[in-house]
Design a protein with these regions (language model features):
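N-terminal-proximal low-complexity accessory segments that begin disordered
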Residues: 1-121, 125-128
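Generic, well-ordered alpha-helical scaffold segments in large soluble proteins
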Residues: 74, 78, 94-101, 182, ...
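Long, charged, glycine-rich C-terminal linkers/tails
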Residues: 93-98, 109-120, 435-458
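Long, contiguous, structured domain-core segments that constitute the functional module of a protein
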Residues: 261-422, 482
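Short, hydrophobic/π-rich interface segment
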Residues: 418-438, 442-444
Length: 497
């Protein structure tokens, strides 16, 4: 036994000496530090050679390359396990979504992004302690309302983008209802994500399977609380975006190279879970910020030609089983026009991918609220209008302005007629003088087609007034029904005859 150990030591020493000479001939170390590094490397290689984990040849470069390749394979196996773990994917999704929002937003003294690090579970535990009439004592209310909107000199929040996913379960409905109250009080729309489980699905890839989405909500008792939430006034301040969008290309030499080592991420075009996705609420947040930066209003946030497009999405192509090449849909699933209309009708904001391109579009921007139906057609039309986010953003901003204006006017000597005249002159700054002929750019900067303000005295309370603002925004095209007819004469020609 002792002789075997002696022979092993002698063999190791001989191997180290020979390989040291090979490396010195190849690399030619010029300093003592370099020679020491070579000696240390040789010792490590010799130990691995004796364990029969590697084979050393006379070609030093080839031996080292083989060793590095073996290390890269081991690292790749471990990194793949980390990258595709559920906890890591959730963490990466949050950071890449936030990076998408910040990188695509041009901030300045008027457009600011503030980040609050609070998990959905933590927020639910907190809001649960302030249920009922105590909701206005919650930390969220104080943060969003009191510290900004309700504070002299405060800067009201224009929108809240939350990296959460909600479904119809009682805890989610309870939390969403509490948040909606705060958002409505502060006139700050709340945009977040919808989970596929809200439609009883494991993944959004199942979205094409149901024949009728509306029946899921109307013929299932599980959605009683959800439908009740949709019927509230506060629900108009909630927007649920879906599905997720691709946050990055898979790592690989031909897709997303890694400089540190040779790494190929283990992905499969058919395996949805092995990709990195981000919340669609971030994409909607980018559109909202872009509209505000360009026009000062958040009205152009939906539609292909009106600010709803999300550009430069990662596009990953992969070989198919039949020998062809396919592209992974960067929005989880391609949504048809019919399905998009169904989703909007049921209170969602779908992100629709344009086929064979790297961009997608928010066609609609419907809030969670289900518009009420009245006997009066005008009242029903008003309800439909107030349930759409582009119009709500404009009204919310006017609410922010008005609170600041009224706060500054307190104590001034103003009669009712003076207040009414002043408000009407002020509101006309945001009314398009010629809405029938003005450009889309003008409509975006002046979001109102007409406006009127009425100020009334409050009986029994001198110095107090009640102001009513009537705002008519520019209507955005929601749909167009086309009929084709074969005729011998055009209607205009027949009328002329």
């Amino acid at each position: 036994m002792a002789k075997q150990q002696v022979h092993a030591v002698e063999a190791q020493a001989a191997t180290q000496s020979d390989f040291t000479q090979l490396l010195e001939r190849e690399f030619r170390p010029k300093t003592d530090q370099a020679r020491a590094a070579v000696e240390h490397a040789v010792q490590t290689l010799a130990e691995q050679a004796l364990t029969q984990s590697i084979t050393i040849s006379d070609d030093a470069y080839k031996s080292i390359a083989a060793i590095i390749a073996q290390i890269d394979r081991k690292l790749s196996e471990q990194i793949n396990l980390i990258l595709h773990h559920d906890d890591y994917q959730a963490l990466e999704s949050a950071w890449r979504g936030l990076n998408h929002l910040v990188s695509n937003t041009e901030t300045d003294e008027h457009l600011k992004i503030r980040v609050m690090d609070v998990s959905k579970a933590e927020l639910h535990r907190t809001m649960r302690r302030y249920k009922g009439l105590a909701w206005d004592q919650s930390p969220l209310f104080k943060q969003i309302y009191e510290q900004e909107y309700g504070q002299l000199g405060g800067e009201p929040y224009g929108c809240i983008v939350a990296d959460y996913y909600f479904d119809h379960t009682p805890p989610d409905v309870d939390l969403l209802g509490s948040i909606a109250k705060v958002a409505a009080a502060a006139h700050t729309p709340f945009v977040t994500g919808a989970a596929p489980s809200v439609l009883q699905m494991e993944s959004w890839q199942e979205l094409a399977n149901p024949r009728d989405l509306t029946k899921i909500f109307t013929q299932n008792l599980e959605y009683t609380a959800w439908n009740s939430l949709r019927n509230t006034e506060d629900a108009r301040y909630v927007g649920l975006a879906m599905p997720r969008f691709l946050a990055r290309l898979p790592y690989g030499a031909k897709t997303n190279p890694v400089d540190q080592f040779d790494f190929e991420e283990d992905t499969n075009g058919s395996d949805h879970s092995r990709y990195g996705w981000a919340n669609a609420a971030y994409a909607m947040g980018v559109n909202i910020n872009r509209s505000f930066k360009q026009y000062g209003w958040c009205s152009l946030i939906r539609g292909v030609e009106s600010g709803g497009t999300v550009d430069n999405l990662p596009c990953h192509t992969f070989p198919t089983d039949d020998g062809g090449v396919d592209m992974k849909c960067p929005t989880e699933i391609a949504i048809s026009d019919r399905r998009e209309a169904e989703l909007s009708k049921n209170g969602f904001i779908p992100l629709v991918h344009r086929k064979n391109t790297d961009h997608a579009t928010f066609i609609g921007a419907q809030s969670l609220q289900k518009p009420a139906e009245y006997h009066d057609p005008d009242a029903t039309a008003n309800a439909n209008l107030s349930a759409r986010l582009p119009y709500l953003f404009a009204c919310s901003r006017f609410a922010h302005y008005l609170k600041c204006i009224v706060r500054d006017k307190i104590g001034a000597f103003k009669e009712r007629e003076d207040m009414q005249r002043w408000f009407n002159e002020w509101i006309m700054n945001y009314v398009d003088a010629d809405p029938a002929n003005s450009s889309q750019d003008t409509k975006a900067r002046r979001p109102l087609a007409a406006a009127e303000v009425l100020v009334e005295d409050v009986e029994g309370n001198p110095g107090y007034y009640q102001a009513k603002f009537f705002l008519r925004p520019h209507f955005q095209l929601e749909g167009l029904t086309v009929s084709l007819r074969l005729v011998t004469k055009l209607p205009s020609i027949k009328e002329a005859a």
